[in-house]
Amino acid sequence: DLVCAAVSAVVIGGLNSLENHANYFIEIKDGYVSLNAKSLANDHDEVVLDTIITSLLTIEQNYRKYIKITQERTD
């Protein structure tokens, strides 16, 4: 499935690009990804996380029938 492949590439590629993996609780299940930061992300990781979110939201805009993005952010 095209949507699944796109989401997988964005998420796995993005998570692999994070510099400080120990700073995150990451849960990946069939059709579900959750990432919780233990502390503030460094500048590099913030850009990576913003890129993941933007990419997923773009996929969602085009394929609303197949994907739903939910964000919870605390500042």
Q: Model-derived features: where do they sit?
A:
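N-terminal intrinsically disordered, cationic/polar leader segments
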Residues: 2, 11-75
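Conserved helix-adjacent loop modules within structured domains
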Residues: 5-6
